[in-house]
């Protein structure tokens, strides 16, 4: 899971951020939060949540996310608007920021996702020169792809030495590590 992957990164002195949807997806992060807490490692858990008014209403994906990690996070913020001041982070313990969204934000997120996947990423991968100038410690997470996008992504992976996390929904099952 993304949570345990983040624990591994934290053990190697990275400061990972896990972003997840609402509901039981958040609950799946409890065990990684406990691991990071007892290992004195920082992980920032950013969780999307339904509006605060949905709590205790029985609405889908409206479990009580605020404080779900209990004492295993140094801080838990329940945010439904942009804070006016700085947020304190203890970089030796996990932290949870629960972001409560109203429905009008959905269309913006979908538009941004569509733009990022189709314009920025896919167009670069499909271009004639699929050799990209990659600098630094980058991780590419490849999730659900359209069938026509798979060949371009496979070509990119074959021609570039990058760290990749392939989700099952990506439809990519080849080994591009150069190892048998």
Question: Where are the language model's segments positioned?
Answer:
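N-terminal alpha/beta PP-like core and its mobile active-site loop of ThDP/TPP-dependent enzymes
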Residues: 1-180
């Amino acid at each position: 899971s993304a949570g345990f992957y983040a624990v591994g990164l934290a053990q190697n002195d990275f400061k990972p951020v896990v972003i997840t949807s609402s509901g039981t997806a958040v609950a799946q992060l409890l065990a990684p939060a406990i691991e990071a807490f007892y290992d004195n490692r920082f992980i920032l858990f950013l969780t999307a949540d339904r509006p605060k008014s949905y709590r205790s209403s029985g609405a889908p994906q409206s479990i009580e996310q605020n404080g779900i990690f209990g004492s295993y996070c140094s801080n838990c913020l329940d945010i439904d608007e942009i804070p006016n001041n700085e947020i304190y982070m203890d970089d030796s313990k996990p932290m949870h920021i629960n972001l409560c969204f109203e429905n009008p934000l959905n269309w913006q997120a979908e538009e941004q996702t569509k733009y990022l996947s189709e314009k920025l990423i896919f167009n670069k991968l499909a271009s004639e020169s699929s050799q990209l100038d990659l600098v630094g410690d980058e991780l590419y997470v490849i999730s659900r792809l359209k069938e026509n996008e798979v060949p371009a992504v496979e070509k990119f992976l074959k021609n570039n030495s990058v760290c990749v996390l392939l989700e099952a929904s990506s439809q990519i099952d080849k080994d591009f590590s150069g190892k048998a």
